[in-house]
């Protein structure tokens, strides 16, 4: 029983330490990186360049998985694109 509690505790700690986020990556002006059908390879490369685990074209913009906390992603409520 103690071993099971220890295992669960370790897994929870790993989840906290290796926390990442998912979302639309943004350009310096705050706009999403645009893409078109068939450009998932390009989006995946852009996401990995930003230290994400992977990405794809979720038309009309690149969606990334596993981004570090310091990478800015699109936020609907704080949208600065075109302003």
Curated annotation (Swiss-Prot):
Q: List the disulfide bonds.
A: 31-81, 35-57, 43-62, 47-64
Give an example GO biological process.
defense response
Report the residues modified as Cysteine amide: 81
Q: Looking at the keywords, is Disulfide bond present? A: yes
Q: In which tissues is it expressed?
A: Expressed by the venom gland.
Domain LCN-type CS-alpha/beta positions: 21-82
SUPFAM superfamilies per UniProt:
Scorpion toxin-like
Family affiliation: Belongs to the long (4 C-C) scorpion toxin superfamily. Sodium channel inhibitor family. Beta subfamily.
Q: Tell me what this protein is called.
A: Toxin TdNa3
Source organism (scientific name): Tityus discrepans
């Amino acid at each position: 029983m103690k071993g099971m509690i220890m295992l669960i505790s370790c897994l929870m700690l790993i989840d906290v330490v290796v926390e990442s986020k998912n979302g639309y990556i943004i350009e310096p002006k705050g706009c999403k990186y645009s893409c078109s059908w068939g450009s998932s390879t390009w989006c995946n490369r852009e996401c990995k360049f930003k230290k994400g685990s992977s990405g794809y074209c979720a038309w009309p913009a690149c969606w990334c998985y596993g981004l570090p906390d310091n990478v800015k992603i699109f936020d609907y409520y704080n949208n600065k694109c075109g302003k």
